[in-house]
Amino acid sequence: MLRRFTGLILTTTALSLAASATAQTTLAELDAENEAVKSVVEVSSPIDYSDHDILMERVTVSKGGRPRVAYDFLRSQDVDFVGNQVSFLASQDISALNENDRLAYWLNLQNIVTVQAVLEDGKKKKSLKKLRGTADKPGKLWTKDRVTIGGQAMSLQDIETKLLTEFDNPNVIYGIYQGVRGGPCLMRKAYRGVTVNETLEQNAKQYVNSNGIVTVKNNVVELTPVFLWYQDAAFKGDDKVLLAHLKDNADPNLKSALYRGRSFASTSLNYSLDFHDVNKAAQERAAANRPAARPRPRTTPQPQPRPSGGGYGS
């Protein structure tokens, strides 16, 4: 079944114009770009994710290779489209899907529901530390019922638990979007069953090798808490399994350092809201492109005439 949010391009004109201002892109180019997104050959999938692709392309901006949602710039229509996509996924019958298609489905649902949850409860927060919480003590963002699947109300915690228990793949953790900058990044394209495992492998390598995620100091492997949150579910609670996983995904320099690792330590997680500030980016770009002020020409001071009859004794 093919579906289209036919008004998506028109109702997100404000976001498109912001993108054009910051990237010096004309509206015509944006329309052409949107048509290109729609014309991409759809990978075979029992669920049509083309609207998901278009939506995520329109509401996210790639910042340093990491897609971030422009929460502050989304209008009510954009929020509605996010909700419509959540409703569409919630209405799907997934009982006959194979394992990879089910995995892709739950990852896509988790990602878009997280975006919706942040829009509802967290977009005005600089930090999601309290709202997100931890694996042991999840906050409201994770525990509040967000979507109904098959007549059952589900929270992000419920969706996460399903992903971790139903699919025997440690790379699943790299598809669980946390809404924070210290977690795995949001995808600008939907997961598809035929490519989901390869995509998660790419996510794993990107995350493990990201700055500050995994470091080795004095034979201690310092990790972001995300790995320790999921150690039991993804790595059997075994430090050796986790270390082997990190080595498999590390680049040569990090991999060499990991061989010196003898123990693990948890670092702090960057709970900053994972969003792109369109206005700030525009201001920074404008400042960078502003021509330097010309120095004022130096003038030689002219001698002032002495007043007649002047002097201290007059």
Regions flagged by a language model, labelled:
Residues 19-23:
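Boundary at the C-terminal end of the N-terminal hydrophobic targeting segment
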Residues 1-9:
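Bacterial N-terminal signal peptides that target proteins for export
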Residues 8-17:
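Bacterial N-terminal signal peptides
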